Regions:
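N-terminal amphipathic/basic-hydrophobic helices that include classical n-h-c signal peptides
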Residues: 1-14
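Conserved, well-structured ligand/cofactor-binding cores
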Residues: 12-282
């Protein structure tokens, strides 16, 4: 007898039994939790979509920024300062240093590094966000971030120092720095300077264009990536707990009708209904 599936709870209970994801394509469709786990934990490759609509969207976003700069339109964080300094216009000579200043200013994280899984999940979430075409970043930036994931270059991100409210500014600044060949990364099982890892991987340090440093750090991708890892672990715990319960009931010669659908329907709790259905299956 099958359990009732409400709000996808039953689907989530069976997540661990779904077909393995071997590749994640960026820029076409939304990436679900299994896709994030496939990249973060299992090293599934990421590729940028070749579809014209995706590439046109990215180019149009970048072009809009260029047009604003050419017209001397003030652009926050590009031609102005950050935060309370948003009313301060910067000289054209100082524009290239603005992004570097942002990166170094936020390099104040503390604590042990985040795990490899959590960091890779955060990087993928940032890539997915930027690939939507609203942040005026270029395709080469996305390619560099994808290359880091595919080559196993993982920035060393301190686990403490972010409030997440307007963005995981501090932790994401470490991703920003690593892409530019600064700070440290984990690569080939070792912790090393990012510049050395880039040389070994035959990658060039990325030269960020206007606004790209701000676009990289001003998002909540780190907390999103960590949440994805935690949710996946919780799903596995639910599956394990449900299996253990079924085994215990069987050992004690319990009755399946104790988990009859009518009992769950009386309370209408989706989780209870789906766990009861899974117990009946087992």
């Amino acid at each position: 007898m099958q359990g009732t599936n409400r709000d996808g709870v039953g689907d989530r209970l069976k997540m661990s039994r779904k077909k393995e994801i071997r590749k994640v394509t960026i820029g076409e469709t939304a990436v679900s939790l299994p896709g994030i786990i496939a990249v973060a934990r299992h090293g599934a490759p990421v590729v940028l979509s070749e579809k014209a609509a995706f590439r046109r969207r990215m180019e149009n976003s970048r072009r809009l920024l260029s047009q604003a700069l050419e017209a001397d339109v003030p652009v926050y964080g590009v031609t102005t300062g950050f935060g309370k300094s948003c009313g301060t216009l910067l000289s054209k000579k100082s524009l290239p240093q603005n992004g570097e200043t942002l990166m170094r200013f936020h390099g104040c994280g503390t604590g042990d590094p985040l795990g490899i899984e959590e960091t890779r999940a955060a990087m993928l979430c940032r890539l997915l966000c930027l690939a939507r075409g609203y942040s005026a970043v270029s395709l080469p930036l996305l390619e560099q971030l994808a290359a880091f994931l595919n080559l196993g270059i993982t920035p060393v991100i301190p686990s403490e120092g972010s409030v997440g409210a307007s963005g995981d500014l501090t932790p994401l600044s470490y991703v920003l720095g690593a892409m530019a060949g600064e700070r440290e990364v984990f690569y080939r099982g070792k912790r090393m300077p990012a510049a050395k890892a880039l040389r070994l991987a035959k990658l060039k340090p990325y030269l960020f264009g206007p606004k790209e440093p701000l676009s990289m750090v001003n998002g909540t991708s780190v907390m999103t990536g960590i949440a994805a890892i935690v949710l996946d672990r919780a799903q596995h715990l639910i599956e394990a707990a449900t299996s253990a319960t079924a085994l215990s009931v069987h050992a004690l010669r319990g009755k399946a009708h104790h988990y009859h659908p009518a009992i769950g329907e009386a309370k209408s709790f989706p989780g209870q209904i789906d766990v009861a259905g899974r117990l009946r299956e087992l």
